[in-house]
């Protein structure tokens, strides 16, 4: 099986359409379909900050849950939206406010439909996907070699948030260790979460979050070809979001 793994979309629907078309997908049915049966995989954070979060929920639900032709691994923004939909007490900030604004503008029956679809998508998707006979792992923020196969709280925190130190940058975002430098496994780890100006290959890991929602690009990794394909963002460039990885 061949995969096209998509970086953090964050509601950037137009960029997602442009990228999938560049990858050879046809949208005539209203969904991206590849003539060679390549499958899409999403590294999470499909919502928040961008303009079309709810449409992205519908598309990914349709591909992953209804048609079962794609893979989705949730990100930290997905986890927070899930908790919001469950009625938990979450802070409506850091991008969630854009998704909530879209949601609250809907009539109640459409709200219920979106909520049910996202809850189903989240609950029926694993923390990470192991594909191609363990040669490939798709997740949100990365995973240590010794965590592969585990699902406990410590691993969940790492996979959703990265290797956080507990310290904060001046803008309140967490300081993260560069776990990829220490990774010695042979399974390819494809992930996103931390915006980088160019796809970042380190050992057998690839960060494909090139900051579409911050005016960078939306990037896919073609597997097993190990080629990256990108399209430019239509949004304003926010340089401070592309912080060097320490």
UniProtKB/Swiss-Prot annotation:
Cofactor annotation: Ni(2+)
Function: Asymmetrically hydrolyzes Ap4p to yield AMP and ATP.
Enzyme superclass (EC): hydrolase
Listed EC numbers: 3.6.1.17
A GO term, aspect molecular function: nickel cation binding
UniProtKB keywords: GTP-binding, Hydrolase, Nickel, Nucleotide-binding
Keyword Membrane: no
UniProt signal peptide: none
Catalyzed chemical reaction(s): P(1),P(4)-bis(5'-guanosyl) tetraphosphate + H2O = GMP + GTP + 2 H(+)
GO CC terms: cytoplasm
HAMAP family: PrpE
Name the UniProt record assigns to this protein: Bis(5'-nucleosyl)-tetraphosphatase PrpE [asymmetrical]
Similarity comment: Belongs to the PrpE family.
Organism listed in the record: Bacillus anthracis
């Amino acid at each position: 099986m061949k995969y096209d793994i998509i970086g953090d979309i964050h509601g950037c629907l137009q960029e997602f359409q442009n990228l999938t078309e560049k990858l050879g997908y046809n949208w005539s049915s209203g969904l991206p379909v590849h003539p060679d049966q390549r499958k899409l995989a999403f590294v999470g954070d499909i919502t928040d900050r961008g303009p079309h979060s709810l449409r992205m929920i519908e598309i990914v639900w349709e591909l992953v849950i209804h048609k079962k032709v794609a893979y989705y691994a949730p990100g930290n923004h997905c986890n927070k939206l899930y908790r919001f939909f469950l009625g938990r007490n979450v802070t409506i900030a850091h991008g969630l406010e854009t998704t909530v604004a879209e949601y609250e503008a809907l009539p109640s029956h459409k709200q219920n439909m979106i909520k049910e679809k996202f809850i189903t998508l989240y609950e029926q998707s694993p923390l990470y996907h192991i594909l191609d006979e363990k040669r490939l792992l798709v997740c949100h923020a990365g995973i240590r070699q010794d965590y592969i196969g585990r699902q406990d709280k410590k691993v969940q925190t790492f996979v959703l948030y990265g290797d956080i130190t507990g310290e904060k940058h001046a803008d309140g975002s967490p300081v993260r260790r560069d776990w990829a430098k220490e990774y010695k496994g042979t399974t390819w780890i494809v992930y996103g979460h931390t915006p980088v100006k160019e796809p970042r290959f380190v050992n057998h890991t690839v960060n494909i979050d090139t900051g579409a929602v911050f005016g960078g690009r939306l990037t896919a990794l073609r597997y097993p070809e190990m080629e990256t394909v990108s399209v430019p963002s239509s949004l304003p460039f926010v340089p401070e979001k592309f912080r060097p990885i320490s």
